[in-house]
């Protein structure tokens, strides 16, 4: 509805009408310049002038359509392995195959299908579809791209008080999720009000975590169960072992008792390859390795004390800060200690002392990373102090390969799961180094500055394309490496094998040479002792007597000097004589001197 209002005013109230006409210009006033005022003029220097140098900005609005996503699942029942058979365990699969091959129905089906398949195979072999018709043409040169990496996503700690990302774990099914453990590792420096939550992130949604895990104490380690992706195992800062089931929510499903847990933070937790998928073990800086079954967390099933003296004394145990277990070697495991020593253990040994097989000393500081090569398990990688080292189980005295000393401390390392000669390291200055010792041994193939703060942990995806790095401020950066770093190269396995064997052989030769030199030095020392004659060993009595006399007189003279000094201290100080007395004393001394001179002359006569 329109509203109209009419203003009314009389014509007489408008005033007289203006009549304008053209005329010539007129000069109304003319002021002549004053020279006296010109002499008083002073230029201002400096001059304050206001300017505006801010960036001009404009506001624009855009309406973009939201990309909606939904999760769908498919349950495939036909085919595959039975539930009681773990496809990752070689022994179980071989046993199941042998059982199926003995079945009569399987044998009859193979016999019936064999004739059909034989006809198809003969057809395939009749013509070589890969035959080259133009051998004379020059092969096209393959352009090798430079190694590179790019940032895919960044997952930031949603809490206001930032914590360090201490451990990462990839989801076993498709690696579409990432579990991150957050904790403050500075002893008794945790800020007031710091949250103890850790999170599971979806790679497609970096804005909000998919699930928050709420432990009783901040988590130092966190691992997905490879058999059941809904179950996670965590090691707490107070030494407890916690277990979660994501189907039940954020709260802890199983928790070990404080009395039977570790006394220090749990720096390593690993799932074991078992039929039930419920067995695991943990390591801590209290010097203990404990085995657990998550169905009964009241006490550990087994405990090993890391006492390299093999006396099983907890006060002499070395603190464990990294843990390694290879499923192909189910009885062996390795522990990296705070003292820079790697301990190789055998779980199936009869006594606790025999469970510690050998040690590998080689670092000046704690060993923050320890991992076997996925292609050659006899060789393993360690990171401690300012270097990364590659070891062989056949050479215990020294490593076979090592990097140069960096300016910043190394914090973590991992092998590439697809290339045997590639490994990754992180540093305290926020740099990620990618090493490929098949092409270059002295320097990293690629160094990438991920962030300004220190990088604490890293984890490589199973296909080797993605790398997750956790920083001191809780920022997890997801990186994608170039195809050259995530694709197996031609003859790379043979090159890596020959390189490991050559370096191991070289270290053995050096160890043997050092052993010979030590034996020679020991023999020379023993020979010098035997060559000493009886005269050299005989006691020189005169020398001993003279030495004893000198020591005796030295003691006597020292005592006399001490007594004289004490007597001087006890003697009273005489008063100062007057000038007259001084004159009398001087005259007496002169007279005494003259008498003495006369006596001397008489004696001479």
UniProtKB/Swiss-Prot annotation:
InterPro entries: Dynein_IC, WD40/YVTN_repeat-like_dom_sf, WD40_repeat_dom_sf, WD40_rpt. GO terms for biological process: cilium assembly; cilium movement; determination of left/right symmetry; outer dynein arm assembly. This is Dynein axonemal intermediate chain 2. It is found in: Cytoplasm, Cytoskeleton, Cilium axoneme; Dynein axonemal particle. Residues 579-605 have a biased composition (Acidic residues). Belongs to the dynein intermediate chain family. The gene is DNAI2. It comes from Homo sapiens (Human). Residues 568-605 are annotated as: Disordered. Part of the dynein complex of respiratory cilia.
């Amino acid at each position: 509805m329109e509203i109209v209002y009419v203003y009314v005013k009389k014509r007489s109230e408008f005033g007289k009408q203006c009549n304008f006409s053209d005329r010539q210009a007129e000069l109304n006033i003319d002021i002549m310049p004053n020279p006296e005022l010109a002499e008083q003029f002073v230029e201002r220097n400096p001059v304050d002038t206001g300017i505006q140098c801010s960036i001009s900005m404009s506001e624009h609005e855009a309406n973009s359509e939201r990309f909606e996503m939904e999760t769908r699942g498919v349950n495939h029942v036909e085919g595959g392995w039975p539930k009681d058979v773990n496809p990752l365990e070689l022994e179980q699969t071989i046993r199941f195959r042998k059982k199926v091959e003995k079945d009569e129905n399987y044998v009859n089906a193979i016999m019936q299908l064999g004739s059909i398949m034989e006809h198809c195979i003969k057809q395939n072999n009749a013509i070589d579809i890969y035959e080259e018709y133009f051998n004379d043409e020059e092969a096209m040169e393959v352009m090798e791209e430079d190694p590179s990496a790019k940032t895919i996503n960044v997952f930031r700690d949603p809490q206001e008080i930032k914590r360090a990302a201490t451990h990462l774990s990839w989801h076993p099914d498709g690696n579409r999720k990432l579990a991150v453990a957050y904790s403050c590792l500075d002893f008794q420096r945790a800020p007031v009000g710091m949250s103890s939550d850790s999170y599971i992130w979806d790679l497609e949604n970096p804005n909000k975590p998919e699930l928050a895990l709420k432990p009783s104490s901040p988590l130092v380690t966190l691992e997905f169960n490879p058999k059941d992706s809904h179950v996670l195992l965590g090691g707490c800062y107070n030494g407890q072992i916690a277990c979660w089931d994501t189907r039940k929510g954020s709260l802890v499903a199983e928790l070990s008792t404080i009395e039977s847990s570790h006394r220090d933070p749990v720096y390593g937790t690993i799932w074991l390859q078992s039929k039930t998928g419920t067995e695991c073990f943990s390591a801590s800086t209290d010097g203990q390795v404990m085995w657990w079954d998550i169905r009964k967390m009241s006490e550990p099933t087994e405990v090993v004390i890391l006492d390299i003296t093999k006396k099983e004394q907890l006060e002499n145990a070395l603190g464990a800060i990294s843990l390694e277990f290879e499923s192909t070697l189910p009885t062996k495991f390795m522990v990296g200690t705070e003292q820079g020593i790697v301990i190789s253990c055998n779980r199936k040994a009869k006594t606790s002392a025999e469970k510690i097989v050998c040690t590998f000393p080689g670092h000046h500081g704690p060993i923050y990373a320890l991992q076997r090569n996925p292609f050659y398990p006899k060789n393993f990688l360690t990171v401690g102090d300012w270097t990364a080292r590659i070891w062989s189980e056949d050479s215990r005295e020294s490593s076979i390969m090592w990097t140069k000393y960096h300016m910043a401390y190394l914090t973590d390392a991992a092998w590439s799961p697809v290339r045997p000669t590639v490994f990754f390291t992180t540093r305290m200055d926020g740099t990620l180094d990618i090493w490929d010792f098949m092409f270059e041994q002295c320097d990293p193939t690629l160094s990438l500055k991920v962030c300004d703060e220190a990088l604490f942990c890293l984890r490589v995806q199973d296909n080797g394309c993605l790398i997750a790095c956790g920083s001191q401020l809780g920022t997890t950066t997801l990186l994608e490496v170039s195809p050259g770093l995530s694709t197996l190269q031609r003859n790379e396995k043979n090159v890596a094998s020959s390189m490991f064997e050559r370096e191991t052989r070289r270290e053995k030769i050096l160890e043997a040479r050092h052993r010979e030199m030590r034996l020679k030095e020991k023999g020379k020392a023993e020979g010098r002792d035997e060559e000493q004659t009886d005269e050299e060993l005989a006691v020189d009595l005169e020398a001993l007597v003279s030495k004893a006399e000198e020591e005796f007189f030295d003691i006597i003279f020292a005592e006399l000097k001490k007594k004289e000094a004490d007597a001087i201290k006890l003697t009273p100080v005489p008063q100062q004589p007057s000038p007259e007395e001084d004159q009398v004393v001087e005259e007496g001394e002169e007279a005494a001197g003259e008498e003495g001179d006369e006596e001397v002359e008489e004696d001479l006569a």
